[in-house]
Amino acid sequence: IIWKDIDYMFIDMPPGTGDVALTIMQSIPVQGVVMVSTPQPMVSMIVEKACHMCEKMEVKVLGIIENMAYLECPNCHERIEFYKKEDVETLCNSTCTKLYGTLPMLDLIRDINEYDAYSKEQQEKVDAYISDIATEVLEDIA
């Protein structure tokens, strides 16, 4: 594929340190990687291994986004921590990376592929969760 002049390319890859990640890092000039984790020890371990692989490949890990970090009550919007909060903090410390932010478990995000288009209200709800994270990532790669 030949792309015209582009500023940024985001590639969503499968988790881990498999052939896909290695091939991309060897084939494309990668300026940085944003890892996405969930607050579970096994996932944190996989992300930590991927961070170490990036280090060996001399690819900078910009930071970590914690996905599915908590539930939000639909009535009162109280944040319900389902997993231990320490997992992502330990991961960031062990990989010397920063935490860009956390995202809740949202049915709207879960069902994103089922919508042809978001309503304005749905888009605003998703934007409220990701806009600060996206802004910080873009600032770091600019």
Name what the model sees in each region.
Residues 1-4, 26-29, 56-57:
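Conserved catalytic network of the ASCE P-loop NTPase/AAA+ motor domain
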Residues 13, 26, 133:
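Glycine-rich phosphate-binding loops of nucleotide-dependent enzymes
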Residues 14, 41-46, 81-82:
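Active-site glycine- and acidic-residue-rich loops that bind
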Residues 17-32, 41-42:
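ATP-dependent NMP and nucleoside kinases share a basic, alpha-helical "lid"
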Residues 22-25, 47-48, 77:
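Short amphipathic alpha-helical segments
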Residues 32-41, 45-64:
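Helical hairpin unit composed of two closely spaced alpha helices linked by a short loop
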Residues 53-142:
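C-terminal lobe/tail of nucleotide-utilizing enzymes
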